[in-house]
Regions:
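ABC transporter nucleotide-binding domain
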Residues: 23-108
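Conserved mid-core alpha-helix of short-chain dehydrogenase/reductase
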Residues: 20
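Short, charged/small-residue-rich alpha-helical element at the C-terminal edge
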Residues: 76-146
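Helix N-cap at the start of a conserved alpha-helix in ABC-type nucleotide-binding domains
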Residues: 15-17
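A residue-level structural signal marking coil residues immediately N-terminal to beta-strands
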Residues: 1-2, 33
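ABC-family P-loop ATPase nucleotide-binding domain
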Residues: 149-151
């Protein structure tokens, strides 16, 4: 068929079958098939969808081309992997903590300049992060912002 509907296509699949199904999905997309997918796994949506609609309680909260949506947010996130506690220093530079993990930190930044100043201070204090990446927010983060804003 030219049009395929998938409802939570990866739900309940183990990693091996997930990879098998991803291969099938890629083949279908490569063959020019149109796929309408409902999913709560935003990483899957990012991987396979060009256009999207995010619904909350039956109402559209975001729709459009995925690249354009993400581009409209800009590079507002900072990922830092570091073995040192850098949170107080980050907060003193106006960075807002989104998440602390075993491997590092995720911050929201107002500008590249604030991230640059933060990095300069880290280096001046002889703190050298393994990773320092300014990036656009993930679709998962955008979903949380949009759906959380309408609840």
């Amino acid at each position: 068929p030219e049009l395929i509907f998938l409802d939570e296509p990866f739900s309940g699949l183990d990693p091996i079958n997930t990879d098998v199904f991803k291969g099938v999905l890629s083949e279908l997309i490569g063959a020019g098939k149109y796929i309408v997918m409902s999913s709560h796994q935003m990483s899957t949506v990012e991987e396979y969808c060009r256009d999207l609609v995010i619904l909350n309680r039956g109402k559209t909260v975001l729709q459009g081309n995925l690249r354009q949506i993400k581009a409209s947010y800009g590079h507002t996130n900072l990922s830092v992997s570091c073995g040192t506690d850098i949170l107080p220093l980050a907060e003193s530079h106006g960075l807002r903590l989104l998440e602390k993990t075993a491997g590092g930190y995720e911050f929201k930044i107002d500008s590249d300049a604030s991230a640059q100043a933060f990095l300069e201070e880290l280096v001046a204090r002889r703190i050298f992060p393994e990773r320092f990446e300014i990036r656009e927010p993930s679709l998962h983060e955008i979903f949380i912002e949009k759906v959380g804003a309408t609840d």
